Every structure is written in structure tokens, then in C-alpha cells.
Design a protein with these regions (language model features):
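N-terminal export signals
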Residues: 1-13
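Acidic, metal/ion-coordinating pockets
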Residues: 14-223
């Protein structure tokens, strides 16, 4: 599943702005790294420079400023032998992201491949703010918050994080007892809740641009 990230709404109306000013807010977004710590395909035993944590770290270091928001939209711990490290104290992919210093991390659909206990363990290792506001435990507890507010250069940024509802199709057994709600509906509730408290709202969504399987809310265009 592809990940989509985009600005949703400016939170303040022009009429409510007393002093106009501008700044450059840069958003660096990564996703679908799929266990690639280095630019190397371990299964094929050959170089693969299509994207890796090492390359991301370099790009982020070269471009980061005081007004840069760095986010990742998941599919991090699956493929390229990454599953071999799920029982480590800190998964090497997570350790690398911690070293880079991400602001926000959102789960991808492949994070659910190994069961919820494993996922919760891995998420506890993240230093970034973990967001996934549409997955709930059997007790009704959210897997993670649905949003966070981050200040960059005096700008209050509301960041919403959701995962595709189709994880119940692909990992139904792993999600037994858990509830996955519609990410579009959840996002709209959050927008109404925080729109007067932030300057801008962005969404970090691990889902396609258009709907998959005709499922409403599985594409960001519904938002």
C-alpha cells in the first residue's frame, strides 16, 4: 500500500489574522522502506539504491532546518530480512530512525504482519511521536494517538496519522478482537477538534490516493 502525505487545511481564516507574516515550513516524508537499512537487497545479494534508511539519513541531514518536520508513514519492519530482528531490544530499523530524529511515525499495513503484541513492542521503541488514530484494542484503547501538535519556528502544526482500513482484509487473524475504524471519519473529527488551536493541519496517511477494493475511506481523496 502506498502512503500519502499532504496538507489538509489552513486552520485559521484570513479574517482572524492580525499581523501577516510568512515562513518556509519544510516537510520531509519517508515511507515504505521495507527493512532496507543499507542500499542492499539481502535476498538477491546485490545493491539496490531505490531507497534505504542510510540514504534517507543523508538526505534529511543535508536538507533539515529549524523549520523542518520529518515524518515516516510506515512499512518499516517488513521485508529484506527485517523480521529477523523483531525480538531485539530495539529493532535496527527503529534504532536508525531514532538516530535520524523523526518527529512523527505512522504505522503502515505491513507493521501488522507479525501480530499486535509484536507491533506494540516495536512501537514502544520509537522515539518519534507514534500516530495511528483508527486502530483500537479489544478494551477500546487506541493503539496510538490520532494526532499531535508540533511547534516549528512558531508555527503550530497539527499532524494527523491514520492507516488504511484494509489491514482487516490483509491481516484479519492478527487483528482478531481489535477494531479498525474509518480513517477519513476519524480525521474529520480531529480536524474539527484542533482547527482553532493550530496554524496548519497535515495528514500522514498510510493508504492509497484512491480507494482500494471500493472501500470508502481507504483513499485520501475521500478526505
Amino acid at each position: 500500500t502506498a502512503a500519502a502525505m499532504g496538507g489538509l487545511v489552513p486552520a485559521a481564516s484570513a479574517a482572524g489574522i492580525k499581523d501577516l507574516w510568512s515562513m518556509d515550513l519544510q516537510i520531509l516524508a519517508t515511507s515504505d522502506t521495507h527493512g532496507k537499512f543499507d542500499p542492499w537487497d539481502y535476498a538477491a545479494n546485490k545493491a539496490d539504491a531505490s531507497g534505504s534508511v542510510a540514504q534517507q539519513a543523508t538526505a534529511i541531514k543535508e536538507n533539515r532546518t529549524k523549520t523542518t518536520l520529518v515524518v515516516d508513514a510506515g512499512d518499516t519492519i517488513q521485508a529484506n530480512s527485517a523480521e529477523l530482528f523483531l525480538n531485539d531490544d530495539v529493532h535496527p530499523m527503529i534504532a536508525a530512525q531514532n538516530a535520524i530524529g523523526y518527529d512523527v511515525y505512522v504505522t503502515g499495513n505491513h507493521e501488522y504482519n507479525y501480530g499486535m503484541a509484536t507491533l506494540e513492542k516495536v512501537l514502544s521503541q520509537q522515539k518519534a511521536k507514534v500516530l495511528t488514530g483508527n486502530v483500537y484494542s479489544p478494551e477500546g484503547k487506541p493503539l496510538a494517538d490520532g494526532y499531535t501538535i508540533i511547534n516549528k519556528g512558531g508555527v503550530k502544526i497539527g499532524v494527523i496519522g491514520m492507516v488504511t482500513p484494509n489491514i482487516t482484509r490483509w491481516d484479519a487473524k492478527n487483528l482478531e478482537g481489535w477494531t479498525v475504524t474509518n480513517p477519513v471519519d476519524e480525521s474529520r473529527k480531529i480536524i474539527d477538534k484542533i482547527k482553532n488551536d493550530v496554524d496548519v493541519i497535515i495528514g500522514v496517511m498510510h493508504m492509497d490516493v484512491d480507494n482500494e477494493y471500493g472501500v470508502y475511506g481507504s483513499g485520501v481523496t475521500d478526505l
